Amino acid sequence: MANLAASTCLYSWLLVLLLSSVSAIIDEDTQVYIVYMGSLSSRADYIPTSDHMSILQQVTGESSIEGRLVRSYKRSFNGFAARLTESERTLIAEIEGVVSVFPNKILQLHTTTSWDFMGVKEGKNTKRNLAIESDTIIGVIDTGIWPESKSFSDKGFGPPPKKWKGVCSGGKNFTCNNKLIGARDYTSEGTRDTSGHGTHTASTAAGNAVKDTSFFGIGNGTVRGGVPASRIAAYKVCTDSGCSSEALLSSFDDAIADGVDLITISIGFQFPSIFEDDPIAIGAFHAMAKGILTVSSAGNSGPKPTTVSHVAPWIFTVAASTTNRGFITKVVLGNGKTLAGRSVNAFDMKGKKYPLVYGKSAASSACDAKTAALCAPACLNKSRVKGKILVCGGPSGYKIAKSVGAIAIIDKSPRPDVAFTHHLPASGLKAKDFKSLVSYIESQDSPQAAVLKTETIFNRTSPVIASFSSRGPNTIAVDILKPDITAPGVEILAAFSPNGEPSEDDTRRVKYSVFSGTSMACPHVAGVAAYVKTFYPRWSPSMIQSAIMTTAWPVKAKGRGIASTEFAYGAGHVDPMAALNPGLVYELDKADHIAFLCGMNYTSKTLKIISGDTVKCSKKNKILPRNLNYPSMSAKLSGTDSTFSVTFNRTLTNVGTPNSTYKSKVVAGHGSKLSIKVTPSVLYFKTVNEKQSFSVTVTGSDVDSEVPSSANLIWSDGTHNVRSPIVVYIMVVDEA
């Protein structure tokens, strides 16, 4: 018996060891892939998860695949995420019904007077349809939310809309209410926001009006969202390490089925991906098919060209720009000269002056003076910096300032158009002012300065596109202009998580904070889209997008080449009040997008799987991508000929008044030599919802390779001005 027991024990130990070894091999050789299978089958006996498990068993040869299956997408579209080897991935990609198999990549976050700036005033000063606004649900896919924030209080709210099919699954000590009606977590951390990003974006889109808010006295005023009476559903897909593709797809799968009216998502890749490998493009397509508009951020990789993310035409892509309010932080030198820098500095040093030390003068033995001037890590001698204001030629000094004992920091800002928050007194100077500061330091035996608390300034020139905002052209669908629109995304005050850091290595905790990024611009447009939808609940996503784009303000963008063109701002700056009365709209449906994808050379077989419909990509059913009925017109030229001729075909739908006559007018862009003919030049609409088609032929020669040629087409009936940008370009020269 003893020998039997010993043998059994030994066998069990060997079995555990073997299984552990196999598990280790699987973990080492596999990675998470997403298997996208298009629309859900209409067969009554089809069970998605069973199909997914069957595929895995077939490919892996394993009867138990619980350790392989990560997620199953089964509510709004079909697919799954699983741990696969490269050979297994290849096998699955060949299976009938599979559209694409792509790695689970990690995406990144695209991180109050703004609504007043756009003309949406507080209280009774703004026209609202409160009954429908209260039935509008905005899905926020982000880092979660802080449910206790006043911005999400349900005081005065009735029960959730009857159409709501979601849940409150926020985790421990997380409670939803009649304002924050839903919460889902895909990170195993719970839906509570620990970074502040998701709380910030949610309150910008749909937060309640909260008076007397500020960041330690900076930017004092009322914080509110665009549609404060609407409901919010929070979907947490991001952690400190990023946002996984498989979680993003799962959040779309749920949000669509839960019954949201609109999705705002301030997340993306640094560069665009092909549609079938892009989780946001996939999710947004199925949202569009269900009548749900997806609004997303353009990215923060500007002003370099071709950096815009979210380039699919069924995604509303938002750039970031300034408002008329800004923050400046003055630096007063020992000689009395004042330099106006940029930061959000809440530290009050009472105007006291401290010694200045330039990084290169505090170089340690590990670095040369040039590297130390940038305040690179491990380059500074602590004894020379302690108790002084550190002066750096770049932003890296913020990471080491505290460790070397600096009392404050002044740097040459790489983004002098933006005020950033820091964990110690700071000011970022323009290159010219920084040069002046260095000259002062080098001319004095005991240079000193004071870094003052931030001041708020108004009535500055605006809107201006932020330098960080990602630029086009679109590298996936080259004839679709992206970004689509711009909105406030610089120095935005909104709700924040008390568990989050207002800046890196910051020990302070706040309920409202200031951030900049296309992440902040995106929820502004989401709020506007929801606002328009409250007046036109039957409008499709494309009609809402068109109304916003064709009524946008003209804007300015600084920089050389494409950085200052429509590739920076699309149709212009969002104008919420004008969007309520566009007159005419460019309308698209699912079939139009399928025809567009046919024109992008997707096969009939693939598109049938994606759409769930019978698709034939014949000459009759496919369209050139530039002829998609989009509110903007863009074409990339071959560049082989000095002369060119391009035609765009469009159709407008009358949503204004019956018996309307619209006349066309073309306004050429600065320096443009384009010849543009509109046929017919006049459109007559007898009834509301009537459609009329027209074509725009653009001819010219010798288009500049660095700057696109552009114009604006305006259809006007004397009351409405329906404006669409027209852009033609050859290639893009990287100006970096």
From Swiss-Prot:
Q: Which UniProt keywords apply?
A: Autocatalytic cleavage, Glycoprotein, Hydrolase, Protease, Secreted, Serine protease, Signal, Zymogen
Keyword NAD attributed = no
Q: What induces it?
A: Accumulates in roots after methyl jasmonate (MeJA) treatment.
Q: What is its main location?
A: secreted
Write out the GO cellular component annotations. Answer: cytoplasm; extracellular region; nucleus
Q: Which residues are glycosylated?
A: N173, N220, N381, N459, N601, N649, N659
Q: In which tissues is it expressed?
A: Specifically expressed in root stele of the root hair zone.
- PROSITE patterns cross-referenced by the UniProt entry: SUBTILASE (PS51892), SUBTILASE_SER (PS00138)
Gene3D superfamilies linked to this entry: 2.60.40.2310, 3.50.30.30, Peptidase S8 propeptide/proteinase inhibitor I9 (3.30.70.80), Peptidase S8/S53 domain (3.40.50.200)
Which stretches make up the Inhibitor I9 domain?
32-110
Q: Which residues form the active site?
A: D142, H197, S519
Q: Where in the cell is it found?
A: Secreted
Q: What is its EC number?
A: 3.4.21.-
Domain named PA: residues: 353-437
Can you give the residue ranges of the Peptidase S8 domain? 114-580
What's the short name of a Pfam family annotated to this entry?
Answer: Peptidase_S8
The record's similarity note reads: Belongs to the peptidase S8 family.
Its protein name is Subtilisin-like protease SBT4.12
